[in-house]
Amino acid sequence: MALVKVKPTSAGRRAVVKVVNKDLHKGAPYAPLLEKQIQNAGRNNNGHITTRHKGGGHKHHYRVVDFRRNKDGIVAKVERIEYDPNRTAHIALLCYADGERRYIIAPRGLKAGAEVVNGAEAPIKAGNCLPIRNIPVGTTIHCIEMQPGKGAQLARSAGASVMLLAREGSYAQLRLRSGEIRKVHIDCRATVGEVGNEEHSLRKLGKAGATRWRGIRPTVRGVAMNPVDHPHGGGEGRTGEGRVPVSPWGTPAKGYRTRNNKRTDNMIVRRRHSK
């Protein structure tokens, strides 16, 4: 992969920085693994906005990605690496020895023609998926289950990875990129390596329209609103918040803890912001 600056033929092109990957498949995706994706523009079944700043954007299909990796003991060959508009990471199309095809999150360094395998006996190689109990301490992993058999939930975005720190009894300790250390059952599965497309965070879209293509609408500052619309609103001329920064509903916006799940608090060994 390489970062490419675009020739500044216009103001909208001047700031563009693209991530170019010549190994990406240039054709259509694998049709049997596509599903229709309905765009709701952040509205619920009543038509009310439940998530702001969503709407528009280019139409696309959902790619069904295999997050469970439960097809054990059968070698799969990587047919190609594809772009996925639904996530920051790229996806790899696997063809198993019995002819079945599945998409997985493409790890860093995985290329077409490589072989991967799932199961407890799988070797420690990038792209292989196996239970955490069989992975050596100190290994970098991604696509980690939080409950056995539920499917990967942790470290799925571009460039993400988790360090396996230790195993104590039935649980393993993982250090996330945020600095959080949490426990996960050793029967949960994880994939060896880190997620590919790690240069995704270095790209620059260059213009507002490119953000709109992705279904993201503009964000209006609270201080630019009227008092009826936001706690920061109102005032004569340009003014600041005049108070602790809050959301439109009055929740403190900076540093306020909003986690409220006591049932799983004991799984977090060290919070991400603790010193």
From Swiss-Prot:
Question: Which residue stretches does the UniProt record annotate as biased composition, category Basic and acidic residues?
Answer: 229-241
For whether the record's keyword set contains Cell cycle, the answer is: no
Organism domain of life: Bacteria
Question: What is a GO molecular function of this protein?
Answer: rRNA binding
Q: Where is this region: Disordered?
A: 223-275
Any Pfam family hit = Ribosomal_L2_C
Per the record, GO CC terms?
A: large ribosomal subunit
Which UniProt keywords are listed?
A: Ribonucleoprotein, Ribosomal protein, RNA-binding, rRNA-binding
Q: State the PROSITE patterns in the record.
A: RIBOSOMAL_L2
- Any single GO BP term: cytoplasmic translation
User: What family does the entry list?
Assistant: Belongs to the universal ribosomal protein uL2 family.
PANTHER family reported in the protein's UniProt record: LARGE RIBOSOMAL SUBUNIT PROTEIN UL2M, RIBOSOMAL PROTEIN L2
Function recorded in the entry: One of the primary rRNA binding proteins. Required for association of the 30S and 50S subunits to form the 70S ribosome, for tRNA binding and peptide bond formation. It has been suggested to have peptidyltransferase activity; this is somewhat controversial. Makes several contacts with the 16S rRNA in the 70S ribosome.
Q: How does it assemble?
A: Part of the 50S ribosomal subunit. Forms a bridge to the 30S subunit in the 70S ribosome.
Q: What is this protein called?
A: Large ribosomal subunit protein uL2
